[in-house]
């Protein structure tokens, strides 16, 4: 219904280059085949041993919310004629390094596929693994091969050759992802078509499908709920909670400054807030109001403050961003002046006016980025010398955070249910283009306004016509270094 949004951001297609693996910590995700739930240790609370889930590093998987599941099922149904994720099954998404955004899909303790956003085509692409056949029966984009071809394809990952094909779905185009089936309907592999169906039908020899390597991991389907998942992880959550509470108490004892919570409206700062409340009781909330927050974020800050009886100190300079924009243009991943101008400096002034100095507990986690992985757990930001920052959940994964929030029945930002995995400013240059596409659907008025601002700067500076369309506004130089604000 917001298809006109795509006129604002039309981007170069991603390359198929292999992305580097990023290890930020031990991958803790396991699966209990007895309870059919993810578990963050080698033993489930039910007493059963668990098995590791082979997700791509950094392995910071999260729950798939209903909107995520609806989107994935729509993508698979449009392409293969059948949805992937059945009702009542626990599904996880694991963001992996990609040219834009790519999420692995975990079902039954195995990665059964992925979805990848293709900005140049303004669509999501399904990337199934053979394991997906445990959950779906494709009716489109299928290639059926004779019995003689089955062993080499299934066991050795051989390509599908023209002589071995019994039938190919007429919808298959060159470059499409396809399921490869035996004559009796068994899925023996998946891959990418090298030619379209018509061409394949006329071929006497040659490769029709380049098969993707079959991986050993097999899912074990079974229904469960998130309440079941929380119960299965109770020993883990109790241990992580206790360690974080000890950290908060020690940090408060060693720093004489007024303790506060830096709250952004995101999941990590919410989990941190819950820990701090249990450790040392009610403390003030520091909220950095940039003027660029989502409406849902303001609602969440108010709801959290009411629920837990906390006073909110808001650092607000809503004109600072646009004044700096008029001089410098938009912020970029390698020049995030927005964090200094709209967050750090106003927060510093707020602290100085109210307490002189303070201790702030911040929802930083090492699984978020290389810089945060290397960060100390207690530090001072040079842009906010009035603030000592401390990170109680530095060792937590996103699954620890979500299961803890579910366990505590805490009011989280509902934007997470709309497909966003990180909550910040709506036009953050660190966002991938898939995120902007989602925001264009959920908040079209915000993205329309942002495009108009970019267009005026583009005209004023005489920038290349593709400066907006290609997403070049998000980067000023050629460096891959991304500035961190160290403030959640």
Language-model regions, residue ranges each:
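RNA-binding accessory domains that recognize and position tRNA/RNA substrates
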Residues: 4-262, 270, 274-283, 290-293, ...
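Nucleotide-activated chemistry modules centered on ATP-dependent adenylation/adenylyltransferase
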Residues: 13, 20-37, 43, 49-52, ...
């Amino acid at each position: 219904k917001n298809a006109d949004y795509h006129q604002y951001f039309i981007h170069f297609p991603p390359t198929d280059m292999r992305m580097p693996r990023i290890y930020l910590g031990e991958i803790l995700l396991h699966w209990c085949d007895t309870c059919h739930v993810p578990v963050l240790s080698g033993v489930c609370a039910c007493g059963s041993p668990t098995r590791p889930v082979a997700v791509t590093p950094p392995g910071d998987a999260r729950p798939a919310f209903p909107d995520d599941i609806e989107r994935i099922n729509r993508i698979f149904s449009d392409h293969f004629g059948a949805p992937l994720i059945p009702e009542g099954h626990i599904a996880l998404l694991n963001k992996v390094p990609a040219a834009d955004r790519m999420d692995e899909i975990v079902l039954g303790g195995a990665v059964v596929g992925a979805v990848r956003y293709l900005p140049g085509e303004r669509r999501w692409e399904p990337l199934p693994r053979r394991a997906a056949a445990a959950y779906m029966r494709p009716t489109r984009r299928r290639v059926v091969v004779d019995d003689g071809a089955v062993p080499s394809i299934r066991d050795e990952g051989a390509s599908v050759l023209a002589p071995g094909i019994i039938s190919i779905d007429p919808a298959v185009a060159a470059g499409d992802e396809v399921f490869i089936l035996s004559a009796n309907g068994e899925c023996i592999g998946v891959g990418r078509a090298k030619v379209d169906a018509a061409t394949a039908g006329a071929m006497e020899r040659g490769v029709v499908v380049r098969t993707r390597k079959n991986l050993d991991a097999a899912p074990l389907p079974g229904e469960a709920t998130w309440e079941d998942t929380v119960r299965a992880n109770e020993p883990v959550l109790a241990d992580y909670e206790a360690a974080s509470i000890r950290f908060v108490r020690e940090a408060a004892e060693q720093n004489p400054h007024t303790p506060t919570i830096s709250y952004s409206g995101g999941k990590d700062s919410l989990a941190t807030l819950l820990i701090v409340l249990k450790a040392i009781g009610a403390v003030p909330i520091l909220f950095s109001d940039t003027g660029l927050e989502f409406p849902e974020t303001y609602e969440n800050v108010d709801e959290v403050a009411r629920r837990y009886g906390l006073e909110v100190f808001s650092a607000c300079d809503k004109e600072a961003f646009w004044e700096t924009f008029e001089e410098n243009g938009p912020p970029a991943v390698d020049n995030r002046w927005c964090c200094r101008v709209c967050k750090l400096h106003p927060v510093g002034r707020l602290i100085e006016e109210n307490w002189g100095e303070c201790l702030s507990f911040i929802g930083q986690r090492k699984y978020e980025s290389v810089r945060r992985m290397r960060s100390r757990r207690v530090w001072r930001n040079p842009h906010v010398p009035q603030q000592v920052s401390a990170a109680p959940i530095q060792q937590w994964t996103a699954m620890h955070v979500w299961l803890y929030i579910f366990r505590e029945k805490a009011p989280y930002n509902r934007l997470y249910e709309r497909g966003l995995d990180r909550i910040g400013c709506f036009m953050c240059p660190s966002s991938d283009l898939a995120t902007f596409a989602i925001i264009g659907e959920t908040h079209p008025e915000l993205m329309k306004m942002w495009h108009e601002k970019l267009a005026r700067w583009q005209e004023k500076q005489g920038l290349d016509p593709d400066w907006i369309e290609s997403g070049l506004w998000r980067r000023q130089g050629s460096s891959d270094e991304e500035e961190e604000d160290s403030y959640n």
